[in-house]
């Protein structure tokens, strides 16, 4: 009855509603014609609304609508009942298939009845109400007409059935397919089999011509099977390719598979092992390779990368056939995944050495293409190229081995040249693609670990791969040519020679490659954002062995800059095409001349100029700016002051090959050149790059090759991020003039420029170097060299500090404080570390510092904008505090040689240095003895004086960085906070609680590397320079 009532309800309501509406209508009509007799009759008829004859048309419409509404409601009710019962029953039946048919029926009946009775009534009432409400709106037509309601009901039903029922395949898996699905079961298996069609992959169907899939499997099978399989595959490929490619049969004459695959970069795979020679031409596809994956030789397999990883066996076979011809790229890729075949171990070892590379080698393939062609011997060819690069490397160390180191040195040079011509555009595009430096940094770390493993291979095989990486990194279009040939190929030698020595011959070497990869002359320089990451690699790599590492660093610089002109890599990238020829000639010694020329190249400074405009304000006031403008002229003289303090001899000794060139350059711009060479490379990366590079190039024609050049990439990223970096460029000039170690710093941050002049630069270098030694530790062999390198570096820094400023050591540590300031300051600081540690032995120190730089840079890059304002504020605070200190020690406005060079420094650099140095000074002073503090205060006061004069311009520039520096200043003002804020100064003592995470990271690194720092401290103490005091404090 309930159900009945529910069903009746809508009809009753509709009738009542109809009556009401009809009465209203009648009333209206009556009111219209009240006294009409016929009207009365009509009224009677109207009153009896149920008589169809008596209804007016409008009433008829209403009635029809009401009837439709009732019907729709009834229909909906029926559907609901069906849903409640039948659909539910269906669900039950599905479940019952698990349990049993009887239970199903029972459950179905019981649930159906209850569900229908309750839910149907409730739903009916609800639907009636809703429909009534809706009808009230205008007409009695239900919102759902019959068809609509039917459709909606059907849809609901379908949904329910799908949800309630288990899919057949699921049931089959669960073994629930019972009587219910028994009929369907046969279908499912058949359908499944058909869908799966494992046979498609099977040989017969593959032969039939599935297309890419078939060709892949067929290729794998054939490679293993032998000539017969290959012949069959060839036929299949011919059929497929002819059908596809030769729609117009005009090309039919050509071997379709070979032609098509070559176009696809699949030539080797498609053609089979037979057309090995064609494959090398296929490798000439390097332009395509640029756009394709580095596994282009395997492009035949649609998923080239996947194929390589998936079918190691097939890949190996392929590598034998096509990889030999295209071995460099394919072999390397294979080397990553698994050792290919014995024939390829050589190339594979390079690849394994360049496993890190291979990651970057997607682009590298393009570069590889060149190198592959040149070291086309495949795996066999590569060892030769690597040997050549090794033999050439010594010259690169002396000069910028970069061009010569290029893997099969000559072959790679030619490769680079050919790539430049054919693949340069593609390489550039690839470099653009590779501009994303974040991935390369990890690779670099990976390479550091692999370095030790691939130490032997790295020297031989790795050099070519670095080339490839660099080529891919060609981010700088102009450098592409130089980078690819001289930059890419030479870089590998640098890494091999410098890095292998630096980090453990093999271990070191790879990191350089990773850095090269990351920094790849083009990419590192071009993608400044990526630079910060890359420089850390370079820093980490070189530290292993100061002597060897350092010469490679110059090479590295060269690679960064461009083959030989790396120093002015920006210029090189600008003039890369013109300088590209140089890379071939550059083999090593030539770099000096090219470097000088490139230094001379003012264009690069012009390029940086845009960024440096803010610095230019300080620059114009400071002679340093002109110095930067004249790449090596001013820096050399200015740095001469600090140069005397610096110990170029140590760097020179370390860099015997480089030493000659560096010495010459250093003579041009003496002492500063060794550290500057490291730092200058960073400057080249930045706007200051040009200026700094020029000085570093002239100062250390060889040293630019050193990692210092790699460090430059980090500065570029900061520049991009911050104009503060632009400010820093002027400091670079000052840096150069003030402190040779600072040259790299200049691009990094003006603060570093000034502070490096002080012995703080030595202390900072020492501290940074300790991180460097930890970095080398990843490659166990490296640590010892790193330690020795730190000692060298420490000595150098002390010398530098002495020349720069007696109390400079702590200030330089203070420079570390700038880390908090702007990322630029941090970058500069790292560079400065590299510079002091890095002319010759600094290889270890700089390389180790570089990794910290990387973190700092990566962290700083984003912070830079904020730091700039913070820095500005900090500068103001510093100015205030310095005002007091100036009053205290106004006697020495520029008394320290450090002070004089700093005035030349751009106001930005001076301000940055003052801020960082002042903070450092405060912190250092607390730990340092009163005498040291007094010296530092005097130097700082003099510097602050000069800087305070320059600060007004700096304030606008660094206004963005002001906030962080301000916070730092308060911490500096409070001795306890100050020490934390200066992780560099007291990282060993306790990890600074600096607000800046980057600083903390650095501090952590330094703390971890305390052993290295302590070792450095020892040398510094031996030096007996003010730096030693700062070192003691640090210890």
From Swiss-Prot:
UniProt keyword Lipid biosynthesis, yes or no = no
Where do Polar residues bias regions lie? 366-388, 411-429
GO biological process entries: cell differentiation
**Keywords carried by this UniProt record:** Lipoprotein, Methylation, Myristate, Phosphoprotein
Compositional bias per record (Basic residues), positions renumbered to this chain: 431-449
Instruction: Give the Pro residues compositional bias ranges.
Output: 543-552, 602-624, 669-685, 709-718, 771-784, 894-906, 961-980
Q: Which residues carry this modification: Phosphothreonine?
A: 162, 531, 593
Residues annotated as carrying Asymmetric dimethylarginine in the record are 320
Q: Does the keyword Acetylation apply?
A: no
Ranges of Low complexity composition bias in the record? 338-365, 517-532, 562-589, 625-645, 652-662, 737-765, 838-848
Q: Which disease is it linked to?
A: Genetic variation involving NHSL3 may be a cause of atypical endothelial corneal dystrophy (ECD). The disease follows an autosomal dominant pattern of inheritance in the identified patients. Clinical characteristics of patients with the atypical form of ECD include peripheral endothelial opacities, an opaque ring along limbus, central endothelial opacities, central stromal opacities and corneal edema. The early phenotype of this atypical ECD is characterized by multiple small white translucent spots located in the Descemet membrane of the peripheral cornea.
What name has this protein been given in UniProt?
Answer: NHS-like protein 3
Organism source for this protein? Answer: Homo sapiens (Human)
Q: Which gene encodes it?
A: NHSL3
């Amino acid at each position: 009855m309930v159900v009945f009532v529910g069903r009746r309800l809508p009809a009753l309501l509709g009738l009542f509603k109809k009556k009401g509406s009809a009465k209203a209508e009648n009333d209206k009509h009556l009111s219209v014609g009240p006294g009409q007799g016929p009207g009365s009759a009509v009224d009677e008829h109207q009153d009896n609304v149920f008589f169809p004859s008596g209804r007016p048309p409008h009433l008829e419409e209403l009635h029809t609508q009401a009837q439709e509404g009732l019907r729709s409601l009834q229909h909906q009710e029926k559907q609901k009942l069906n849903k409640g019962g039948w659909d539910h029953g269906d669900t039950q039946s599905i479940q019952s298939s698990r349990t049993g048919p009887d239970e199903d029926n029972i459950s179905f009946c019981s649930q159906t009845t209850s569900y229908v009775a309750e839910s149907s009534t409730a739903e009916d009432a609800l639907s009636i109400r809703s429909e009534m409400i809706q009808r009230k709106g205008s007409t009695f037509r239900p919102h759902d007409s019959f068809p609509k309601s039917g459709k909606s009901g059907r849809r609901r039903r379908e949904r329910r059935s799908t949800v309630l029922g288990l899919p057949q395949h699921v049931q089959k898996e669960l073994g629930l397919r019972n009587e219910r699905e028994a009929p369907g079961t046969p279908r499912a298996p058949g359908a499944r089999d058909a869908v799966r069609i494992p046979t498609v992959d099977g040989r017969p169907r593959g032969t039939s011509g599935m297309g890419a899939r078939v060709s892949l499997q067929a290729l794998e099978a054939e490679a293993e099977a032998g000539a017969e399989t290959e012949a069959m595959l060839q036929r299949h490929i011919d059929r497929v390719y002819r059908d596809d490619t030769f729609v117009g049969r005009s090309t039919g004459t050509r071997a379709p598979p070979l032609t098509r695959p070559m176009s696809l970069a699949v030539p080797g795979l498609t053609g089979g092992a037979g057309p090995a020679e064609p494959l090398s031409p296929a490798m000439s596809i390097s332009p395509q390779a640029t756009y394709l994956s580095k596994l282009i030789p395997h492009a035949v397999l649609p998923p080239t990368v996947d194929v390589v990883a998936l079918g190691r066996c097939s890949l190996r076979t392929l590598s034998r056939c096509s990889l030999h011809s295209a071995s460099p790229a394919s072999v390397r890729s294979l080397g990553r995944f698994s050792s290919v075949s014995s024939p390829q171990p050589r190339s594979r070892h390079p690849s394994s050495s360049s496993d890190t590379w291979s990651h970057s080698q997607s682009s590298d393939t393009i570069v590889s293409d060149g190198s592959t062609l040149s070291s086309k011997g495949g795996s066999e060819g590569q060892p030769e190229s690597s040997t050549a690069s090794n033999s050439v490397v010594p010259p690169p160390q002396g000069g910028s081995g970069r061009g010569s180191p290029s893997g099969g040195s000559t072959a790679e040079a030619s490769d680079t040249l050919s790539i430049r011509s054919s693949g340069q555009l593609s390489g550039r595009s690839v470099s653009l693609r590779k501009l994303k430096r974040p991935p390369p940094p990890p690779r670099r770390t990976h390479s550091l670990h692999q370095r030790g493993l691939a130490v032997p291979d790295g020297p031989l095989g790795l050099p070519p791969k670095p080339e490839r990486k660099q080529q891919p990194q060609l981010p700088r279009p102009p450098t592409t040519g130089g980078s690819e040939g001289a930059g890419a190929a030479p870089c590998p030698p640098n890494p091999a020679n410098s890095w292998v020595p630096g980090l453990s011959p093999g271990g070191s070497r790879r990191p350089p490659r990773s850095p090269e990869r990351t920094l790849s002359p083009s990419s590192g320089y071009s993608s400044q954002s990526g630079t910060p990451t890359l420089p850390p690699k370079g820093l980490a790599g070189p530290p292993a062995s100061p002597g060897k590492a350092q010469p490679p660093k110059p090479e590295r610089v060269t690679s960064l800059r461009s083959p030989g002109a790396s120093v002015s890599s920006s210029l090189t990238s600008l003039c890369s095409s013109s300088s590209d020829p140089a890379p071939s000639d550059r083999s090593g010694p030539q770099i000096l001349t090219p470097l000088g020329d490139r230094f001379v190249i003012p264009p690069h400074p012009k390029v940086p100029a845009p960024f440096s405009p803010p610095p230019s304000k300080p620059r114009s006031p400071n002679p340093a700016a002109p110095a930067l403008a004249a790449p090596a002229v001013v820096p050399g003289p200015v740095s001469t002051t600090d140069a005397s303090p610096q110990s170029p001899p140590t760097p020179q000794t370390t860099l015997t090959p480089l030493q000659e060139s560096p010495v010459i350059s250093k003579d041009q711009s003496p002492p500063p050149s060794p550290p500057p060479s490291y730092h200058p490379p960073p400057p080249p990366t930045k706007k200051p790059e040009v200026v700094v590079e020029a000085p570093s190039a002239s100062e250390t024609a060889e040293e630019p090759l050193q990692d210092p050049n790699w460090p430059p990439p980090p500065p570029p990223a900061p520049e991009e991020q911050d104009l503060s970096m632009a400010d820093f460029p002027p400091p670079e000039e000052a840096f150069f003039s003030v402190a040779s170690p600072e040259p790299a710093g200049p691009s990094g941050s003006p603060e570093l420029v000034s502070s490096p002049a002080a012995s703080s630069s030595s202390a900072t270098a020492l501290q940074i170097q300790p991180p460097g030694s930890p970095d080398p530790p990843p490659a166990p062999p490296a640590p010892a060299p790193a330690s020795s390198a730190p000692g060298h570096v420490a000595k150098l820094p002390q010398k530098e500090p002495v020349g720069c400023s007696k109390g400079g050591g702590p200030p330089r540590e203070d420079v570390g404080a700038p880390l908090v300031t702007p990322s630029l300051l941090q970058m500069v600081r790292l560079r400065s570390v590299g510079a002091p540690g890095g002319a010759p032995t600094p290889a270890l120190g700089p390389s180790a510092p570089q990794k910290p730089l990387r973190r700092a840079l990566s962290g700083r890059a984003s912070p830079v904008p904020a730091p700039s304002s913070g820095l500005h504020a900090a500068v103001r605070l510093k100015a205030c505090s310095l005002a007091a200190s100036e009053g205290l020690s106004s006697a020495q406005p520029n008394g320290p040689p450090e002070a004089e060079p700093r005035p030349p420094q751009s106001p930005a650099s001076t301000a940055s240095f003052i801020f960082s140095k002042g903070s450092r000074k405060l912190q250092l002073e607390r730990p340092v003895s009163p005498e040291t503090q007094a010296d530092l205060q005097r130097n700082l006061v003099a510097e602050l004086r000069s800087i305070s004069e320059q600060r007004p311009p700096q304030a606008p520039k660094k206004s963005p960085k002001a906030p962080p520096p301000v916070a730092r200043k308060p911490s500096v003002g409070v001795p306890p906070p100050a020490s934390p804020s200066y992780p560099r100064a007291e990282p060993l003592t306790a990890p600074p609680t600096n607000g800046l995470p980057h600083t903390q990271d650095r501090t952590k690194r330094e703390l971890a590397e305390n052993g290295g720092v302590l070792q450095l401290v020892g040398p510094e103490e031996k030096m007996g320079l003010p730096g030693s005091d700062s070192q003691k404090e640090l210890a």
